[in-house]
């Protein structure tokens, strides 16, 4: 089957609810650069069908940073990391709520509360419950997602009772590869936590990290594992190779392949909220706006230990690509018109007619 027929088949199956084949998913990942826009256009047909032109903004709040006992090889907060990240213990509920409020003011519809560590103690869950309460009191309509690691019995239910709407725990990579990136817990531990969250009434959120040296087959494996797990939202991260981590020298991606990965995830999980997540700025670069034709969600602002694109630049990007921000009273185009990130014309003061070198 040629690629055009494969893409038509993927769209048809995405509409009818039929699962694609592994060969079809692999064909997307292995397609040529000449076919990239065809791949994106086909993925957009599913994105538009299920999500229109809306973009959901999510905002991360790192409640506790660094000093994690787990050895996840991609993570700047891992055991033994000498990356110069911020390290601090639990934020007070009012501090976390104030930080969340800034993201909500910037357009975020969901706040993601994250804490480093293997998993929370019951006292930690109490702390997070207080933080959820503080956020919900100030912003009753905002969604709150918790991401605290592996959960013990009853903790998911406690978070749900406190007002949490969702729980994130990423699969990250294929089950057969998981031991290559982490030895202190297992792939099945992660699956169990996502299922525990679902059983407690929390919306499950689980995604991947691409660029860790995995094969195309590994990427397809984890995409189909997510289809089976059926999370409501799927964050797609691209490895940020932090110096001081075992994967600090891994630069395996380019913008075109990132778009193909996003499209493959969309084809395999057509009705899920696919979120463009960590690493988008450094790996997609100027092709970020094109990714909005595949994904329907992004993180606004900074990540847990690294800086992201400026929030007003995110709004500008969404507006210029012709999309709207979900949940706002006005769309991103109107926000741009009101001056969000609007730049004045810069008068040339270099090159010909000056003593300064030209911009070349």
From Swiss-Prot:
Q: Listed disulfide bonds for this chain? A: none
Q: Give this protein's Gene Ontology molecular function annotations.
A: 2 iron, 2 sulfur cluster binding; 4 iron, 4 sulfur cluster binding; biotin synthase activity; iron ion binding
Top EC category: transferase
Q: Does the keyword Metal-binding apply?
A: yes
Cite the cofactor comment: Binds 1 [4Fe-4S] cluster. The cluster is coordinated with 3 cysteines and an exchangeable S-adenosyl-L-methionine. Binds 1 [2Fe-2S] cluster. The cluster is coordinated with 3 cysteines and 1 arginine.
Domain of life, per lineage:
Bacteria
Q: Domain (Radical SAM core): give its ranges.
A: 53-280
Please give the function described in this protein's UniProt entry. Catalyzes the conversion of dethiobiotin (DTB) to biotin by the insertion of a sulfur atom into dethiobiotin via a radical-based mechanism.
Q: Which PANTHER family match?
A: BIOTIN SYNTHASE, BIOTIN SYNTHASE, MITOCHONDRIAL
In Swiss-Prot or TrEMBL terms, this protein is called Biotin synthase 2
| Species annotation | Frankia casuarinae (strain DSM 45818 / CECT 9043 / HFP020203 / CcI3)
Taxonomic lineage of the native organism: Bacteria, Bacillati, Actinomycetota, Actinomycetes, Frankiales
